[in-house]
């Protein structure tokens, strides 16, 4: 099955690090470090088309014209709580980015998202916004977060995740065909509880050591 709204970052380092994260014996500290490392590599691909402009600068040897990022500062939005792991990695690459958080939890019965927190930078209009969440499972949380952000009319929206599955990608494409997804892998399917298979377990619990 092909997903035109999704780019899988096909790189040996990404594949290797993801395999280490999947292992049940991987410690919380290692899981956290690996997620930050993969996030850097995902960010490189997701931000490939950011606009640049030419600026006159002075090097130690001569004056020259060189490219710098153009436009308003990038905004990174983490879907709490596991999205913080990807956010931390991306901030190493773009430390000047503005940061927002959306708190959503999944109702265990309906699998629908319930919002409990929303705090993003003001004036999102015309800004490039990247939404971060390790797992694109049912896609319901991603759909809800993107819908909320669209009310502020951002210039562009992208979604960065560690793992996706066909169900989540299809759901997101149906509701937000304009949003491109960047991921390390597309796994097989969801189980009856809405978890990705083969997956890596609950990303939030493994990231924060809460289980």
Swiss-Prot record:
<dbReference type="InterPro" id="IPR050054">
    <property type="entry name" value="UPRTase/APRTase"/>
</dbReference>
<feature type="binding site">
    <location>
        <position position="202"/>
    </location>
    <ligand>
        <name>5-phospho-alpha-D-ribose 1-diphosphate</name>
    </ligand>
</feature>
<keyword id="KW-0342">GTP-binding</keyword>
<dbReference type="GO" id="GO:0006223">
    <property type="term" value="P:uracil salvage"/>
</dbReference>
<keyword id="KW-0547">Nucleotide-binding</keyword>
<keyword id="KW-0328">Glycosyltransferase</keyword>
<feature type="binding site">
    <location>
        <position position="196"/>
    </location>
    <ligand>
        <name>uracil</name>
    </ligand>
</feature>
<dbReference type="InterPro" id="IPR029057">
    <property type="entry name" value="PRTase-like"/>
</dbReference>
<dbReference type="InterPro" id="IPR000836">
    <property type="entry name" value="PRibTrfase_dom"/>
</dbReference>
<feature type="binding site">
    <location>
        <position position="106"/>
    </location>
    <ligand>
        <name>5-phospho-alpha-D-ribose 1-diphosphate</name>
    </ligand>
</feature>
<comment type="function">
    <text>Catalyzes the conversion of uracil and 5-phospho-alpha-D-ribose 1-diphosphate (PRPP) to UMP and diphosphate.</text>
</comment>
<feature type="binding site">
    <location>
        <begin position="133"/>
        <end position="141"/>
    </location>
    <ligand>
        <name>5-phospho-alpha-D-ribose 1-diphosphate</name>
    </ligand>
</feature>
<dbReference type="InterPro" id="IPR005765">
    <property type="entry name" value="Ura_phspho_trans"/>
</dbReference>
<dbReference type="GO" id="GO:0005525">
    <property type="term" value="F:GTP binding"/>
</dbReference>
<dbReference type="GO" id="GO:0044206">
    <property type="term" value="P:UMP salvage"/>
</dbReference>
<dbReference type="GO" id="GO:0004845">
    <property type="term" value="F:uracil phosphoribosyltransferase activity"/>
</dbReference>
<keyword id="KW-0808">Transferase</keyword>
<dbReference type="GO" id="GO:0000287">
    <property type="term" value="F:magnesium ion binding"/>
</dbReference>
<keyword id="KW-0460">Magnesium</keyword>
<keyword id="KW-0021">Allosteric enzyme</keyword>
<dbReference type="InterPro" id="IPR034332">
    <property type="entry name" value="Upp_B"/>
</dbReference>
<comment type="pathway">
    <text>Pyrimidine metabolism; UMP biosynthesis via salvage pathway; UMP from uracil: step 1/1.</text>
</comment>
<dbReference type="Pfam" id="PF14681">
    <property type="entry name" value="UPRTase"/>
</dbReference>
<comment type="similarity">
    <text>Belongs to the UPRTase family.</text>
</comment>
<protein>
    <recommendedName>
        <fullName>Uracil phosphoribosyltransferase</fullName>
        <ecNumber>2.4.2.9</ecNumber>
    </recommendedName>
</protein>
<feature type="binding site">
    <location>
        <begin position="201"/>
        <end position="203"/>
    </location>
    <ligand>
        <name>uracil</name>
    </ligand>
</feature>
<feature type="binding site">
    <location>
        <position position="81"/>
    </location>
    <ligand>
        <name>5-phospho-alpha-D-ribose 1-diphosphate</name>
    </ligand>
</feature>
């Amino acid at each position: 099955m092909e997903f035109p709204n999704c780019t899988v970052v096909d790189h040996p380092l990404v594949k290797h690090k993801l395999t280490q994260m999947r292992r049940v014996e991987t410690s919380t500290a290692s899981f956290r470090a690996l997620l930050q490392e993969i996030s850097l590599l995902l960010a490189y691909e997701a931000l490939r088309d950011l606009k640049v402009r030419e600026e006159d600068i002075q090097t130690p040897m001569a004056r020259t014209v060189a490219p710098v990022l153009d436009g308003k500062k990038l905004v990174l939005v983490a879907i709490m709580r596991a999205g913080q792991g990807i956010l931390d990695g991306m901030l190493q690459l773009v430390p000047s980015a503005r940061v927002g958080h959306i708190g959503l939890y999944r109702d265990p019965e309906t699998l629908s998202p319930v919002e409990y927190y929303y705090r993003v930078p003001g004036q999102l209009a015309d800004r490039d916004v990247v939404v971060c969440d390790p797992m694109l499972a049912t896609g319901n949380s991603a759909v809800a977060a993107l819908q909320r952000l669209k009310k502020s009319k951002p210039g562009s929206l992208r979604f960065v995740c560690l793992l996706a599955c066909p169900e989540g990608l299809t759901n997101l494409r149906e509701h937000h065909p304009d949003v491109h997804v960047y991921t390390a892998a597309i796994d097989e399917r969801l189980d009856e509880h809405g978890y990705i298979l083969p997956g890596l377990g609950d990303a939030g619990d493994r990231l924060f050591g809460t289980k």
